[in-house]
């Protein structure tokens, strides 16, 4: 949630900043509701002043032995008016809060202005795409030919946008997870966490998925009595890991906190009809190793650069060519104030595709979660950051395509061989 103070003054600058994100701020609504809030606030304070003045008068009358019945009756009436005004103010404030939850984060000053991914800015490239002397196959063809990637079985078990991995391909999938977690914990000092794959609505509200993006989530239903449950499958480990500090007051000496976790992720992929229907790129269920940092405002910019570098290091160790882009205002996620996407080279598509997204959310999520840091007598909102380190299925398909051989086999990257019993190829 953005700072509510920004919605109480001149809205022109805020409207212009949000417009770069494709969000139209309803200035008439916010000006009207703010005037209503001010009026109720003044009314409440005036009534409270009358009550306080009346209490003093009652004391003075009692001291002089005079009759207080009329004044007490008036004060009782005032107390009733105060309760009504306070109730109205609370109801109005709840309306304001619910409306504010729909507003995206404000872009950082150095985020390029743009409408779509076409306006993202390339920051750097690493590695040179391999030159093949045979016909390039896509990962779906490679996996199916090996008999280790089975979309038909997944469709029978569940439906479209699911997969079944078998044999050495399933082993490589597991090896990637172990390699990523070892890198983040041993090399970069993250605390590995095991978190629930089911969270409540407060957790999703804290990180920004609710209330605006409920259609992207899988919600659980109690079929015993057909009642809705306050439970959802996680769309990313960012949700449970970030919410570990929800409602907490942290000591500044504790920060930054660095968490990592491997989890499945579940997404409805609403709005993705017809896109990436073949293969592993866009699935309802996929695995990801996630990084989360909880930091001070002074630490967060530097930590975003570090986190992005940590995700890049995984690709470098796998010798997978990639590029890093800074997202423009119109392509950033709802909660982010600045984001880098890392895109890996896919030979079959002759292009780079997203494999990681690393974001600094500033105090946007912290304000929703009520998470603060204490520095002496002063407290302030923490900053939260998250990043994929990496999306496992997309890393697997990138390895399959970049390490494919003419005979249909896949060479296993050297860093993964210790996790695969020393094997050097998938046949």
UniProtKB/Swiss-Prot annotation:
Annotated pathway: Aminoacyl-tRNA biosynthesis; selenocysteinyl-tRNA(Sec) biosynthesis; L-seryl-tRNA(Sec) from L-serine and tRNA(Sec): step 1/1
Coiled coil: none
Subcellular location as annotated: Cytoplasm
Enzyme nomenclature, EC number: 6.1.1.11
Any one GO biological process: seryl-tRNA aminoacylation
Residues annotated to bind ATP: 267-269, 354-357
GO CC annotations on file: cytoplasm
Keyword annotations from UniProtKB, A to Z: Aminoacyl-tRNA synthetase, ATP-binding, Cytoplasm, Ligase, Nucleotide-binding, Protein biosynthesis
Gene Ontology molecular-function annotations: ATP binding; serine-tRNA ligase activity
Alphabetical list of Pfam families matching this protein: Seryl_tRNA_N, tRNA-synt_2b
CDD domains: SerRS_core
Catalytic reaction annotation: tRNA(Ser) + L-serine + ATP = L-seryl-tRNA(Ser) + AMP + diphosphate + H(+); tRNA(Sec) + L-serine + ATP = L-seryl-tRNA(Sec) + AMP + diphosphate + H(+)
Binding site for L-serine: 236-238, 290, 388
Primary role: Catalyzes the attachment of serine to tRNA(Ser). Is also able to aminoacylate tRNA(Sec) with serine, to form the misacylated tRNA L-seryl-tRNA(Sec), which will be further converted into selenocysteinyl-tRNA(Sec).
Annotated family: Belongs to the class-II aminoacyl-tRNA synthetase family. Type-1 seryl-tRNA synthetase subfamily.
Assembly and interaction partners: Homodimer. The tRNA molecule binds across the dimer.
Protein name: Serine--tRNA ligase
